[in-house]
């Protein structure tokens, strides 16, 4: 991984208990940042796999500390504005500032649009889209008040570029929404020297994906490739990307190297969208 200089900075990472969020937290620390590691630490009714736990969040904290950086762990649901506001306030109280917001928290479930119940739709949209807005709102307010710029990076998806007829209507809608929100926030916050971007992964080897496979079977990935004109990875068909591949993009977009990059959604998809 290239070297970045986040010395003296503070990164606020959501969904940090495992998967991509843990990877992001660890690498922000590796490059010199202190970390606010946030996760929900309880399950959601319509999600068919276990979400991050308190023990996993503590393990992430240990990884950050092993890199020689300070860490604050917070349990919060990104879909709850009061909890988000309190988490941001506690982070600023602890470290004095936030420099980078990593909007990584997300969930997945599956049902055809005409059969999906409202609770499943609401829980996913509330986490994957509303949660990105709420965290961006409250950290964005801090950036404006502080007057020293900032970075917001959010996890979109290749599902934000196309329709997917595999019980993913809510997920597709949310990720399209993240792309639109990213562009709008970039325009609104440019005058405050805040860069706002997103990353669009394809299939990543994380607890979320393995949880979906366990809940719905291997065919959920096989059918995905068939419905979407080929494999998720054109270099190594059948192989998923690793969390660190997405972290690479997060680090770049959070760094001064991407000073004049804003409003984009960067695919890290092993050629998936090229087809």
Question: Over which residues does each language-model region extend?
Answer:
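Catalytic Tyr-x(3-8)-Lys segment
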Residues: 115, 218-245
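Conserved glycine-rich Rossmann-like NAD(P)H-binding loop of the short-chain dehydrogenase/reductase
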Residues: 31-59
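C-terminal substrate-recognition "lid" of short-chain dehydrogenase/reductases
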Residues: 95, 239-268, 273
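Substrate-binding pocket helix/loop in short-chain dehydrogenase/reductase
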Residues: 84, 112-113, 120-125, 231
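Short, small/polar-rich loop/turn modules that mediate ligand/substrate recognition or access, typified
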Residues: 190, 195, 261-263
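Canonical Rossmann dinucleotide-binding motif of NAD(H)/NADP(H)-dependent dehydrogenases/reductases
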Residues: 3-37
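Catalytic loop of short-chain dehydrogenase/reductase
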Residues: 144, 153-177, 182-191, 203-204
């Amino acid at each position: 991984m290239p070297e970045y200089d986040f010395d003296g900075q503070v990164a606020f990472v959501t969904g940090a208990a495992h998967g991509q969020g843990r990877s992001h937290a660890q690498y922000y620390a590796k490059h010199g940042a202190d970390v606010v590691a946030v996760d929900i630490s309880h399950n959601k009714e319509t999600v068919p796999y276990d979400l991050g736990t308190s023990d996993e969040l503590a393990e992430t904290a240990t990884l950050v500390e092993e890199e020689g950086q300070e860490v604050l762990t917070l349990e919060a649901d990104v879909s709850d504005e009061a909890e988000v506001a309190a988490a941001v306030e506690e982070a600023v109280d602890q470290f004095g500032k936030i420099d980078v917001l990593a909007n990584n928290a997300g969930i997945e479930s599956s049902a055809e649009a005409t059969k999906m119940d409202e609770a499943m739709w609401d829980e996913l949209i509330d986490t994957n889209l509303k949660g990105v807005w709420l965290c961006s709102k409250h950290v964005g307010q801090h950036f404006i008040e502080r007057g020293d710029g900032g970075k917001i990076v959010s996890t979109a998806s290749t599902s934000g570029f196309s329709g997917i007829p595999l019980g993913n209507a809510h997920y597709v809608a949310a990720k399209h929404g993240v792309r639109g929100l990213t562009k709008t926030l970039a325009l609104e916050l440019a005058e405050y020297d805040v860069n706002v971007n997103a990353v669009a992964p394809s299939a990543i080897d994380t607890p979320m994906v393995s949880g979906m496979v366990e809940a719905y079977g291997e065919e959920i990935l096989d059918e995905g490739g068939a419905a979407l004109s080929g494999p998720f990875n054109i270099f190594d068909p059948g192989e998923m990307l690793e969390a660190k591949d997405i972290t690479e993009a997060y680090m770049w977009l959070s760094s001064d190297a991407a000073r004049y990059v804003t409003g984009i959604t960067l695919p890290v998809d092993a050629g998936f969208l090229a087809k």
